[in-house]
């Protein structure tokens, strides 16, 4: 399952709950437009870190079936070996850069950065398990060869938009901040 970080009941509602105003309000100058809400951050960590070992086999079977039906080619070059069952978080370069250094990479999650310009050698050595991809299409072969529980798309706006436009998001976790920020 690819999830974005309000459960949406049908695919028509997915697109309608995110308008152009929503995408303009997701970030501000590489950060959040509002002060950090510790309750929301704890919820984000909880949702994106939670793994149910007992449910993994069922999810893996569904994924393998999808990948086989869609004839996805798998190349494991440059993909780190990960033994512990974790979730994947996919983010754009600006979202990655907005994370304070002390929290990078996001703990207990497989971090994947979607960027056309960022290169692996530009990352600090302590980020050796971070995966960099240039396009959404590069994500699918990685999903085939990594042991993971769920894949979360965590931003920014253009990354959300691309996954939504391609109808790749199954579930949306949505926090509404009822205020205007400039």
From Swiss-Prot:
InterPro entries (alphabetical): DHFR, DHFR-like_dom_sf, DHFR_CS, DHFR_dom
A single GO cellular-component term on record: mitochondrion
Annotated positions binding NADP(+): 25-31, 93-95, 114-117, 155-162
EC nos: 1.5.1.3, 2.1.1.45
Residue sites binding substrate per the record: 40, 154, 160, 175
Record's keyword annotation contains Transferase: yes
Similarity field: In the N-terminal section; belongs to the dihydrofolate reductase family. In the C-terminal section; belongs to the thymidylate synthase family.
Protein name from the UniProt record: Bifunctional dihydrofolate reductase-thymidylate synthase
Species name: Plasmodium vinckei
